[in-house]
């Protein structure tokens, strides 16, 4: 791919992205009526995998699954494989390969992930990516492709064009210098626009977009704004490409871009009139209304099309089967109108990282919420309200849903330990070969930013079960500093820090029982 050299020149940190996790893609497939492979035992291919940061964490938590990453950049593939070897993972490898050279002999995969690649490659590579999603996807497999989208990118195109113009006469400077020059240029433009009231009022959103880019990290701006290719397209154009390869568009990962039922009645009615039941037309119209800038498409084989449920009404047994996790704050739950649902959710939010099912929520109501009219009719009413609330929350990305999850062993003094593979993982990514280039992810592929070298020490101390007294005594040999708001480091005791570290390790699911 043509942008190979710039990826070497301006390092793009390889992070996990939760919305690409096979466990999530599996759940979306089941929501829409498909029967994808159990993600814990699947074969997964990522195109444009860089150092492997998006799939290394998944390989860590899913030892029975197999992960293959493909990238053209030799240095990143080599470094990523060194990190994988250091961690000790046996179910993942990165391959230096041109996407154009992949054919059916490369094998079949249950999930194919293409994140942050599609809009930045020539048309011939785009077409090949789509072809791979046909030829190398299992019959019931699911592919994920993200891409920049019109109409939302129309304004962003102007900013990109300004930054490219700022570097027009300096083709030989480094990518990092181009980013700084481009940022300086658009900063001046925004400042001057603000001087003139009529312009500032008319182009307020545009100015905010510029300010947003000025606050972004250089590696992201360099690849988003200054690559030779950044080629947004409309949803309908993307779907046309899929159809040429007999692929079927399912939905966007952002369900608000696919399911209209959460909008007001007028919007729903007009979308129905415009689309006449065609889900792609409906979503394209939503993009015009919402000025959509980015999409994360889910795709399956054309042979699966007749299984898909586009009715926006999903069977109760499917909703009830999902493991759910909260993204609500307590303040948001307090605003709920339905009192029984509010009471249930206020209880569940006390353990926000613990998953639950709709039936778990109903059971809590049956056993703990006192109402005078508690009978079967009332139970059915509460259950219906719960399902409605959960579905709306799923669409609005306030509840995440999965088909399965990793066992989370709680911390017990002198009863649990941290297995070697997890200790190797955080050590390698925090103080070892992967430090600064690969982000840490949890079992849901969410990026974790609060781990540090002291947590590595705590994990190593707990390589065997220990009493807290023993563990803290060992930890007290380490100088521990907490960075305050003013940037100053304040020393704290092992007694203070140990419980904090335990919470982190527990949340990550690192504990096991002997």
Predicted regions and their residues:
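Conserved SAM-binding strand-loop segment of SAM-dependent methyltransferases
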Residues: 88-99
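Conserved class I S-adenosyl-L-methionine
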Residues: 145-171, 186-188, 192-198
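Conserved SAM-binding loop of SAM-dependent methyltransferases across substrates and taxa
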Residues: 51-64
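Long, charge-rich, low-complexity alpha-helical segments
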Residues: 260-276, 280-295, 299-300, 332-514
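Conserved SAM/SAH-binding beta-strand->alpha-helix loop
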Residues: 73
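A short glycine-rich, Lys/Arg-flanked "PGG" loop and its adjoining helix->strand segment in the class I
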Residues: 127-139
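Conserved alpha-helix/loop element of class I SAM-dependent methyltransferases that forms part
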Residues: 13-42
């Amino acid at each position: 791919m043509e942008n190979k050299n710039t990826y070497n020149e301006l390092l793009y940190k390889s992070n996990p992205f939760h919305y690409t996790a096979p466990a999530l893609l599996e759940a979306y497939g089941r929501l829409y009526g498909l029967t994808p492979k159990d993600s814990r035992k699947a074969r997964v291919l990522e195109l444009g995998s860089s150092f492997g940061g998006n799939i290394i964490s998944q390989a860590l938590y899913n030892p029975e699954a197999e992960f293959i990453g493909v990238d053209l950049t030799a240095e990143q593939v080599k470094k990523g494989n060194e990190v994988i070897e250091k961690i000790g993972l046996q179910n993942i490898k990165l391959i230096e390969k041109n996407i154009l050279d992949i054919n059916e002999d490369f094998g079949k995969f249950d999930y194919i992930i293409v994140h942050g690649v599609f809009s930045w490659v020539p048309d011939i590579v785009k077409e090949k990516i789509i072809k791979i999603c046909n030829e190398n996807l299992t019959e019931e497999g699911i592919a994920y492709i993200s891409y920049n989208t019109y109409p939302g990118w129309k304004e962003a195109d102007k900013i990109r064009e300004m930054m490219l113009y700022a570097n027009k006469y300096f083709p030989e400077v480094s990518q990092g210098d181009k980013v700084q020059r481009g940022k300086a240029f658009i900063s001046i433009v925004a400042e001057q626009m603000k001087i003139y009231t009529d312009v500032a009022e008319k182009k307020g959103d545009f100015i905010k977009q510029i300010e947003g880019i000025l606050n972004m990290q250089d590696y992201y701006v360099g690849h988003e704004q200054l690559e030779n290719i950044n080629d947004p397209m409309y949803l309908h154009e993307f779907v046309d490409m899929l159809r040429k390869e007999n692929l079927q568009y399912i939905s966007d990962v952002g369900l608000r871009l696919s399911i209209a039922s959460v909008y007001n009645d007028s919007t729903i009615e007009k979308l129905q009139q415009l689309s006449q039941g065609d889900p792609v037309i409906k979503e394209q119209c939503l993009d015009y209304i919402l000025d959509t800038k980015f999409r994360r498409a889910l795709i399956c084989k054309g042979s699966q099309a007749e299984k898909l449920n586009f009715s926006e009404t999903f069977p109760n047994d499917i909703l009830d089967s999902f493991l759910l996790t909260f993204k609500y704050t307590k303040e948001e739950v307090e605003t709920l109108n339905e009192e029984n649902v509010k009471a249930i959710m206020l209880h569940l939010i006390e353990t926000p990282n613990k998953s639950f099912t709709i039936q778990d929520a109903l059971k809590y109501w049956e056993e703990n919420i006192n109402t005078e009219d508690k009978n079967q009719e009332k139970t059915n009413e509460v259950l219906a309200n719960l399902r409605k609330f959960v579905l709306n929350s799923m669409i609005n990305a306030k509840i995440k849903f999965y088909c399965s999850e990793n066992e989370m062993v709680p911390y017990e003094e002198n009863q649990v330990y941290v297995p070697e593979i997890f200790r190797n993982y955080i050590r390698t990514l925090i103080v070892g070969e992967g430090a600064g280039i690969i982000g840490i992810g949890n079992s849901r592929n969410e990026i974790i930013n609060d781990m540090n070298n002291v947590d590595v020490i705590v994990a190593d101390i707990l390589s065997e079960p220990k009493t807290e007294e023993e563990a803290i005594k060992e930890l007290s040999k380490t100088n521990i500093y907490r960075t305050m708001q003013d940037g100053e480091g304040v020393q704290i005791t092992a007694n203070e820090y140990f419980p904090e570290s335990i919470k982190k390790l527990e949340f990550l699911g690192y504990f096991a029982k002997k």
